[in-house]
Design a protein with these regions (language model features):
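C-terminal beta-signal and terminal closure region of outer-membrane beta-barrel proteins
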Residues: 160-174
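Gram-negative (and chloroplast) outer-membrane scaffold detector with strong preference
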Residues: 40-137, 141, 182-183
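Outer-membrane beta-barrel "beta-signal"
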Residues: 171-185
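Cleavable N-terminal export/targeting peptides
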Residues: 1-26
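Long, low-complexity, acidic Ser/Pro- and Gly-enriched intrinsically disordered regions
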Residues: 123, 150-152, 180
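Solvent-exposed loop/turn segments connecting transmembrane beta-strands
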Residues: 24-41, 63-69, 171-173
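Solvent-exposed loop segments that connect transmembrane elements
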Residues: 149-164
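Outer-membrane beta-barrel and related beta-rich outer-membrane complex signature
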Residues: 103-105, 147-151
Length: 185
C-alpha cells in the first residue's frame, strides 16, 4: 500500500508540466477533518486528484455493539463546476480500502476488511489567505468481508455485527457528512 501511495504522489508531481498551468496557480492542498487527512493536486482549474487516510472511532451503544473503529486509506477525484480555488459547487468521488473492528457488549471483537466508494455533492468556500472549507453529503457503497473474530462469550452478538455491516453497505445519504478544512499552496 505504501508503494501505491508513493507512486500516486509521484505521478501527481510529475504530471504538472503536462497541463500548462502557470507557476502562480496553487497546485496542491492539504485538507483535514476530525478523522481524515488528504493531499490533493489540481490537474487544472476544475479537476483535482489526491489521496487520503484516517481513522474513525464511533461509540455505537446499540444492538449489543459497543463501538466501531474504521481505519482507511484511499484516492479521491474532484470536479468543481466553477473552479477549485474559488467558491464553487463540486462533485467529489472517494474510493478507499480499510479495516473495521467492532467490539460488542461482552468484549468480543469482529474484524472486517473491504472497500468503500462515496460520491459527494459539496460546496467549497475559498478564502484570500488560501484557506478553504468544503461541506457536502452524498451516497456511499461498501463491500466488507469478515476477517476474524475473537469471542468472549457465546451470546451470539456476531449476528448483530453482521446486520450492522449489511446496513452500512449502502447508504443513500452517508452517515458521515463530508467536512474538510484545507490550505492551498
Amino acid at each position: 500500500m505504501k508503494n501505491l501511495l508513493t507512486t500516486i504522489f509521484l505521478i501527481l508531481i510529475l504530471t504538472s508540466p503536462l497541463f500548462g498551468q502557470s507557476s502562480e496557480d496553487k497546485k496542491f492542498a492539504v485538507r483535514t477533518s476530525i478523522f481524515a487527512h488528504a493531499l490533493t493536486y489540481n490537474l487544472d482549474k476544475q479537476n483535482g486528484v489526491g489521496f487520503y487516510f484516517g481513522q474513525l472511532s464511533t461509540d455505537i451503544n446499540e444492538d449489543n455493539i459497543e463501538k466501531g473503529v474504521n481505519s482507511f486509506v484511499g484516492v479521491n477525484y474532484g470536479y468543481a463546476f466553477d473552479c477549485i480555488n474559488c467558491d464553487s459547487f463540486s462533485i467529489l468521488t472517494l474510493l478507499s480500502t480499510g479495516n473495521a473492528t467492532f467490539t460488542t457488549d461482552d468484549g468480543s471483537t469482529y474484524n472486517y476488511s473491504g472497500w468503500v466508494i462515496n460520491v459527494v455533492g459539496a460546496y467549497g468556500w475559498y478564502f484570500e489567505n488560501d484557506l478553504s472549507v468544503i461541506l457536502g453529503i452524498g451516497p456511499s457503497y461498501g463491500s466488507w468481508s469478515k476477517e476474524s473474530e475473537n469471542l468472549k462469550s457465546d451470546k451470539g452478538y456476531g449476528k448483530d455485527v453482521e446486520d450492522r455491516v449489511k446496513k452500512l453497505s449502502f447508504q443513500p445519504i452517508s452517515s458521515t457528512p463530508f467536512f474538510a478544512i484545507g490550505y492551498s499552496f
